Curated annotation (Swiss-Prot):
Organism for this UniProt entry: Oryza sativa subsp. japonica
Domain PA: from-to ranges: 110-182
Role this protein plays: Intramembrane-cleaving aspartic protease (I-CLiP) that cleaves type II membrane signal peptides in the hydrophobic plane of the membrane.
Keywords: Endosome, Glycoprotein, Hydrolase, Membrane, Protease, Signal, Transmembrane, Transmembrane helix
Upper taxonomic lineage: Eukaryota, Viridiplantae, Streptophyta, Embryophyta, Tracheophyta
Protein's recorded name: Signal peptide peptidase-like 3
Localization per record: Endosome membrane
GO biological process, one term: membrane protein proteolysis
Glycosylation sites: 159
Top-level division of the source organism's lineage: Eukaryota
Lumenal side: 36-207, 273-275, 343-347, 399-430, 487-489
Family: Belongs to the peptidase A22B family.
Amino acid sequence: MAFPAPSSSSPRRRGRGLAYLLVSVLLLASRVPGAAGADSEFEDGVSPKFPGCDNPFQKVKVTYWVDGDERSSLTGITARFGEVLPATGSDGDKRKAVVPAPKTGCAKSSAPLASSIAVAERGECTFLEKAKTAESGGAAALLLINDEDDLQKMVCTQNDTVPNIGIPVVMVSQSAGRKILSGMDGGAKVDILMYAPEKPSFDGAIPFLWLMAVGSVACASVWSFVVVGDEDKNAPTLGGEEAADSEIVELQTKTALVFIVTASLVLLFLFFFKSTWSAWLLVVLFCLSGLQGLHYVASTLIVRTCDRCREAKVALPVLGNVTVVTLVILPLALIFVVVWAVHQNSPFAWVGQDLMGICMMILVLQVVHLPNIKVATALLVSAFMYDIFWVFISPFIFKKSVMITVARGSDEGPSLPMVLKMPKEFDTWNGYDMIGFGDILFPGLLVAFSFRYDRANGKDLTDGYFLCLMIGYAFGLSCTYVGLYLMKSGQPALLYLVPSTLGTIVTLGAKRGELSQLWNAKV
């Protein structure tokens, strides 16, 4: 059966005021590797290897104790050289932490290092020289503190002799190193345990994350038809009745250029000015847009099931006539958002983050529309090129992947919240699998367009485009996770999702002789 065509009369559109700006900022700032997770290795296939200097880069769990009090675990990376760390650790493997003198560890230490873990700072000499000095001083391991909030891969050069280092060599970020050093203030005893847990062969979080992403796209695409309904285009808003007259944001071809420039500037800002306050700014923006999303989704669901709730209104100063539903839902949504913001580092905070994120994306896909595949092609191809450049090409310019560095964040301040995430229950790291909002929203705009196009042209699931694009999105996302598994690193999902969605509708349109109509449509 064909989808009912929308009414020929122009429906009143839902206004969102400030939410448009907030959603746009999140859309531009939500660029993280599409499928990301905490892998046990950092292999990239590029860093040089030489005989005796060919260890895999492994992710290291660095746990430390201050006067017997266990602190949070930190993350490090092993060197190409040195002894390989065990996959498990026990209290018997703990070693006392000692800062060598000099603190860079480039010369024989005046502080005794025997059977300890030397905690040295980066600089003044090579990684290999530091390792040789620490080993000659009797250290059981070397823990290097980087001079920036990132992890540097420690390699050998062609001019280096075969290192033959017999102790583990690990690096931690500057912020992680500061935590260890601060624990040693005042003469406190600090013990360190380092080991490299292996990644489990099965990641049970990925199927659930896949379902959330695919379900979000499907739900948001059909929301206005299934939940809101043609008879009720005026869902409750944060403002009064006049707010409902605002038009839906219809993207144009020039949006692609605006996206490339603005998103790149935002990404570079976060890369060069990576700080606690900038992370908190993004958290605040996420909370505001999440509040809008929660209110919108809850309000439309209530109004859909309760006809009388739609009509109950009260007059408020400035806001005008506001529905009773809004007066009830908005405070509850605000409490939910505030509780999440306060407890965002708790083990179950991901539930609230995912709920706010899904509601926000449903709202975005009701507010922002693609009118045809001409605009879709410009936007998605630009986003595709954006992902490729900032993940794979930027290391040749900035010495590291800008997007991955921003997505990884730092050990200080909150993590970037613009992702759907799911805990990896079977992983020793207790990390998360993630997918960025942009990798749901950009293809979602095209999928939502296909649903509106099918309705406008009286097509059903068998001869329309919506079902095919949903299958294409699901297939592309599956390929993303296959790439994650094979390459052992975060994947730019749009690399797979743009061909599987845009390529699908272009191919089908050409085969059916409807490509010109799709290209110039206005739905």
